[in-house]
């Protein structure tokens, strides 16, 4: 089965071809980072308009790279939610228009399910069951994954997502957009232990997260620097130390909660997905913990940590292989800007 995947939930336009027998044949991605940078964040209307411009050229690119014709495609999977309503509508409209014109079925995919399953695209994918740590700009969750479509929420953020905390901290430090990579880069120049920030809910006894207090702690430290009239090299060093303190605190919480989830479920496999899953400090800490605690940790390829069409094509193919009745030829679609992943549990 050959599935075309279309991702357009936020500020990346991604298309891909996934074949159940041959794996990922091709994927193409356009990021809108340069366009949104001057505004300091994603502008939804601009994001939607750019998806319209980029989708069809990317389609031609993946068809050529995958050596496929439209006649070869068996189904079209698209991101149905969650995400920006306008951006989702663009992707859903294009998917259903192509499907109608080509006489193909469609299937709407949960964006986070795509992330959750994306490590299955690696050469040696993790077998079920496993614990999944989903960390992105909008979501931070721990899930028990028994099979495709069989998900149990173990814990989630009560306020800011980890990626959101990274982005807000970047703004407080006067860094550019996107903030997460900028904070991590600055943190590498900081001195470990120079600034120690709180680890919210580290000992809460559950698997939930909270990052708003950590962000507030960064704000408090920045106000102290302003009151001290720090400037020049002194201010640069202080910001690097503060960034290091923030990253260390966030990583400590993510690792500790992941270890607690593995202990609770008695599983030995951890899958990490989402944009924050590309963070070098988080990967290093989890790899070190895996060596000490005797569990396996799996990630998608770095290129597939961000939003992409490959994960949507994969999720569509896996669902259609298990539940062919989920294929639709109605073409009267809806999108779900808010959509709980646990609601997919069968």
From Swiss-Prot:
Q: How is the cofactor bound?
A: Binds 1 Fe(2+) ion per subunit.
Superkingdom of this protein's organism: Bacteria
Q: Which UniProt keywords apply?
A: Acyltransferase, Cytoplasm, Iron, Metal-binding, Transferase, tRNA processing
InterPro entries per UniProt: ATPase_NBD, Gcp-like_dom, KAE1/TsaD, TsaD
Q: Please indicate if the UniProt record lists Magnesium as a keyword.
A: no
- What's this chain's function? Required for the formation of a threonylcarbamoyl group on adenosine at position 37 (t(6)A37) in tRNAs that read codons beginning with adenine. Is involved in the transfer of the threonylcarbamoyl moiety of threonylcarbamoyl-AMP (TC-AMP) to the N6 group of A37, together with TsaE and TsaB. TsaD likely plays a direct catalytic role in this reaction.
Q: Is-annotated flag, keyword tRNA processing?
A: yes
NCBIfam families assigned to the protein according to its UniProt record, in alphabetical order: gcp_kae1, T6A_TsaD_YgjD
Q: Which class of enzymes does this protein belong to?
A: transferase
Cofactor dependence is on: Fe(2+)
Task: Give the UniProt record's GO annotations in the biological process aspect.
Answer: tRNA threonylcarbamoyladenosine modification
Where on this chain does Fe cation bind?
Answer: 111, 115, 307
The protein's location, in the record's own words, is:
Cytoplasm
The protein's predominant localisation is cytoplasm
What cellular component terms from Gene Ontology apply here? cytoplasm
Membership in a protein family: Belongs to the KAE1 / TsaD family.
Q: Residues that bind substrate, according to the entry?
A: 134-138, 167, 180, 279
Q: Which SUPFAM superfamilies match?
A: Actin-like ATPase domain
Name the PANTHER family on file: TRNA N6-ADENOSINE THREONYLCARBAMOYLTRANSFERASE (PTHR11735), TRNA N6-ADENOSINE THREONYLCARBAMOYLTRANSFERASE, MITOCHONDRIAL (PTHR11735:SF6)
Record field: catalytic activity: L-threonylcarbamoyladenylate + adenosine(37) in tRNA = N(6)-L-threonylcarbamoyladenosine(37) in tRNA + AMP + H(+)
Give the Enzyme Commission number.
Answer: 2.3.1.234
**Record protein name field:** tRNA N6-adenosine threonylcarbamoyltransferase
- Could you give a GO molecular-function term held by this entry? iron ion binding
């Amino acid at each position: 089965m050959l599935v075309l995947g279309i991702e357009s939930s936020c500020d990346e336009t991604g298309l891909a071809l996934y074949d159940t027998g041959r794996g990922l044949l091709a994927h193409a991605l356009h990021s809108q980072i340069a366009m949104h940078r001057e505004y300091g964040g994603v502008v939804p209307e601009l994001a939607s308009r750019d998806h319209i411009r980029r989708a069809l050229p990317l389609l031609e690119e993946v068809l050529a790279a995958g050596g496929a014709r439209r006649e070869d495609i068996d189904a079209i999977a698209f991101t149905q939610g969650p995400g920006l309503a306008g951006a989702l509508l663009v992707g859903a409209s294009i998917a259903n228009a192509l499907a109608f014109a080509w006489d193909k079925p469609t299937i709407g995919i949960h964006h986070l399910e795509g992330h959750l399953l994306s490590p299955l695209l690696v050469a040696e994918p993790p077998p079920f069951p496993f614990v999944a740590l989903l960390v992105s700009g909008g979501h931070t969750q721990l899930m028990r994954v028994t099979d495709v479509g069989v998900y149990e929420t173990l814990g989630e953020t009560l306020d800011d997502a980890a990626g959101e905390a990274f982005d807000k901290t970047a703004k407080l430090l006067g860094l550019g957009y996107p903030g997460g990579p900028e904070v991590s880069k600055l943190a590498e120049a900081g001195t470990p232990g120079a600034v120690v920030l709180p680890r919210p809910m580290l000992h809460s006894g559950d698997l939930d997260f909270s990052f708003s207090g950590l962000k507030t702690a960064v704000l408090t430290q920045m106000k102290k620097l302003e009151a001290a009239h720090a400037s020049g090299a002194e201010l640069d060093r202080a910001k690097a130390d503060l960034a290091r303190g923030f990253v260390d605190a966030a990583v400590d919480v993510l690792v500790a909660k992941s270890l607690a989830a593995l202990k609770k479920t008695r599983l030995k496999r951890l899958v990490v997905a989402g944009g924050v899953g590309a963070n070098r400090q988080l990967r290093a800490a989890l790899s070190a913990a895996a060596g000490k605690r005797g569990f396996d940790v799996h990630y998608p390829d770095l290129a597939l940590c961000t939003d992409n069409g490959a994960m949507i094509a994969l999720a569509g193919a896996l669902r259609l292989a298990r539940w062919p009745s989920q294929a639709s030829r109605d073409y009267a679609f809806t999108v779900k800007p808010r959509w709980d992943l646990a609601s997919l549990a069968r």
